[in-house]
């Protein structure tokens, strides 16, 4: 691969010789009479730590003073903010007071805050470079960031300034915030976890970079048409003021081709990957501000571009108009969409291509930055920690090994020692079928050199296993990175384990399960110390302060009068003093009701259905998947509907009204998940128009669920559903968000539900269903023994089969999966317990005083689930990095940040 850099020369200019006062390879020209300042040849990563000190000293004092004098400092009051907004309206957007609408006002306000952030971003990069400290690089295929403007306002502490300033200019801040499209860089919990981690890394002042892909159309925008999910492009990049194109940071990424072995002039055997296709990776940077700190870290996203350019003029002139742009269109598909449909072979190739494109560009960037330090390669893992968020970036292990042996000339063992001390791997699944695998023929065609390296890694690993366990031949096949199937497959999770120094799960149950099930053999090979647990967390800045500002203010008033609890969430335990305070509980209830009114208005606006804010709001919003069991939820709703229909009017008056709210996307190729969405909407169409039922039950599906919608939905929850089959959900984080906002949980003993129960107490959560240790026996009984359906579930299926909710054939596969095909996710086994527990929820909700006590107690005990705690654990036990606090580490006066 090669990087393109920007330099220019002009005839007649004096030749510039390397400066003796600033002995830097990338500097050109002496300092002195006739020279204004050293000229820096643009590189990927700016100056190294030693270089930045030398170059600062080489700049004449008057020039340094001029740069310091005129350096931007960012607005701090309403007047300066208004000045910045008006300036951007008139000079950046070419508008005026007379044609500045809300979209333009959003753009100008965003640009004003962006300018402020980028000033701190520059200083942060200078500070981190000057300190020459170890960095963490977080590789995630998803970063579900949500809206940036509101987050920036709150993190820099100037939302009230912006609110007043926008009001002076004739705008409501709420209207301006709502103009922003969510950044479509993720789908579910994986991406939101990565976003929370970026927030915490910046807020805790850790030197950190995120690396991802800049998806042109996101995963997709979900529309519901006639009850069905329809995927359309998400044009979120139409205006995005939060990114900085780095057109001078371009990396050539190679695909296909062949491997040539040869001997160099010294007779040393060499390997060269040659031929094939080149695609350019172009960098886009997004500033990530910390809360109540000057630290502003970086998220670097890669966009794909044709190496030959966007347009072939020769083909166009010859009349071949389609081919003239074909190369660019083919290249752009790599970063067009998150998770391309992989039901087809071309989709599989595109996914693997996407993953390599991203990790290769990121590794090139990381290695270039390290080489600036002029350190020995043996110090690489002392300066660089790379965390793999799931198996998607696992190719980074192979790519770093390739760089070290093929390009840097290291011996295999030395290179592998560096690689295996650099990476950490976070596993996010306990489902064997969810562990990523790629076919060997696909690898051979797309990445021939990497397949060779994988085979070599596997051979050396298996040889070490055989030496350690000489009489266990079966163990070799069980731990082999190459699965001996037809075709052979590369097991990416196994590669990640072998190439990482630490492997962590994301909840106590999950970490225990992976050690006793899917990775049991690796615990035997490597020992238990390689495996650890870091329970997931969420950032309270977005999920409490931003999503639920009134509750945040109320909590602040009871925890010392400041927002300190947002940086130390354990301060929430002060709230337990007020569980019997009537005035406090009254204000708490008023805030919850106001949030429910806000959600009810959103439901009315988006679906046309009117719901009663006084009803119990029962919410399940997350990625649609059979293991998350939205199907059990909607079957429970149908059971409730049938029960209401069978009641007399007098009996119905005793019922607590309920609104069942669903949201989430199904993968485009996941037909069963799409069927669940169709059933939810079909049930809603019947129930919401049944006059016998009225307000006693409403069924709502909110389309295109995303972070900004979650900020409306989660604070309004009374009960939220986290009902995955026990042992299938690694952690989950939406459960934490709901509880932090004063909602209770109905859930199984799975993922983080267990640890939430440990923290808040069994009396404050509604648990049901079988335990993880029972699951395999139940599945065996389904397939080889008796499988009797719960009578209530049978009645639900009968109603579906009678076309109560539309054509029964549309839902035949969903019902058949339970009745005839083994009920893999144990809906039938847990359905009775689920309904009984829902009845307990109904009863508990009637006693509002006791319900509020449960809610307040739960929030008070949620301090453990901050992503700040999570990141500190990673930093200490896996990454071995230290925070770099502004003002405590010295710094540079330079105004050119390291890129």
Stretch-by-stretch model annotation:
Residues 2-899:
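A conserved ligand/cofactor-binding region detector
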